[in-house]
């Protein structure tokens, strides 16, 4: 039985949880939108993508603030089991 391929979105988004990867690819920005968008306390410029490949964990910074302003080249295509963390802004 094939395990459903998903990515996980946590932290300051409206609906944290898993998002299925169906057919086409999805980016960090799109996954956040599918999670209801950024929460009121989000710090989008400090968003992190946590990826484990071959047992090696890497943390990739993804500046959602710049991507929202049109710098689409900064967005990252997600792989199964990727975890997106949107931190809370510190005031």
Task: Label every PLM stretch briefly.
Residues 1-91:
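Ser/Thr/Pro/Gly-biased, low-complexity, turn-/loop-rich segments
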